[in-house]
């Protein structure tokens, strides 16, 4: 087949109508709505729920939703739980479906060596469910639940990244659009924030961690300058607050009030919240989704199919092989069954472990009750033996003879 395609350019003599395509796309997008899946990860108390609510200017999640739920007596076995919250919000007729995934319990255990594993499993599970839906014959109802943006909240220590931070980011940086965030930056001075940013970026570069950077369109100077400003602000030092406070000049702003002054959430001179909002929502929401679909998901899909023994070359784009397609579907089905089996085994092992712990607690209670009853019985036996000894001792002592009754005097005048 010849690849030399001759393109003939002609000037149209009349209005055809394809110049109306952007309007068609706009109407379709408004009718269909948009979606955004955000994973917000970090230790408890770093203001994840507050920042998400500040981003969308409404209560998407509550602080209780992200609280750590574990027994006080088992703090050494804190487990990471995955929680998801969905909300549909509307602004000027445009609908946005927001899904926020959090991981309460992350970093709260004594041993955090594999604290990242449930988070990575959740990301992979979402890729797998999308791959499964995409492989069906009827794909009209494919729901995109893949993670579009991964906000990692860094504790504002002012030093450098911890081993846990590096371990998690190295596990997820090739699966998600990683966006590091310095939480509660109002606890640091401007100089400390600048130095902290340099150390974080140095650690990220040294570890080979990839973070999401928006595309710089050089042909648009204003847009390019805005993009470079966003990139230069990495990692974002943010402050979140949904409360309004009054500034010294009388303005009502979203922010936090301190004895030394007011820090404004929406003021770029105070923190990087505005730049984070531009990256996530205002300017690059669709780019985040496209990069997830065209790069991150495709890389995951290719690697997964290779592990399953399915090789793909350029011939699939030139012809359709039903046998190969059937083999691919069979392999995907087997992978799905294997995944379900692994999940069932995991649930079974978890239930067995919980049952064993319950039996161990019951056994300990029974031992304690047995010991208590044995101690009581021993005390009763000892008490009875003491009483028996006292009785035997009393028998051995000499007893006084019984008193003789006094002789009765005979009455005179009567015969006896």
Curated annotation (Swiss-Prot):
Pfam families membership: Septin
Stretches the record annotates as G4 motif: 183-186
Domain (Septin-type G) ranges: 32-307
Domain of life: Eukaryota
Binding site for GTP: 42-49, 79, 105, 184-192, 240, 256
Any coiled-coil regions, as ranges: 323-399
UniProt GO BP: mitotic cytokinesis; septin ring assembly; septin ring disassembly
Chain intervals for the UniProt region annotation (G3 motif): 102-105
Record InterPro entries: G_SEPTIN_dom (IPR030379), P-loop_NTPase (IPR027417), Septin (IPR016491)
Disulfide bonds listed in the record: none
Residue ranges of the region described as G1 motif: 42-49
A molecular-function term among this protein's GO annotations: GTP binding
Stretches for region Disordered: 392-416
Sorted UniProt keywords: Cell cycle, Cell division, Coiled coil, GTP-binding, Nucleotide-binding
GO CC annotations, alphabetized: ascospore wall; Gin4 complex; mating projection base; prospore membrane; septin complex; septin filament array
Subcellular location: Bud neck
Its biological purpose: Plays a role in the cell cycle. Involved in the formation of the ring of filaments in the neck region at the mother-bud junction during mitosis.
Family affiliation: Belongs to the TRAFAC class TrmE-Era-EngA-EngB-Septin-like GTPase superfamily. Septin GTPase family.
Name of the protein described by the UniProt record: Cell division control protein 3
The organism of origin for this protein: Candida albicans (Yeast)
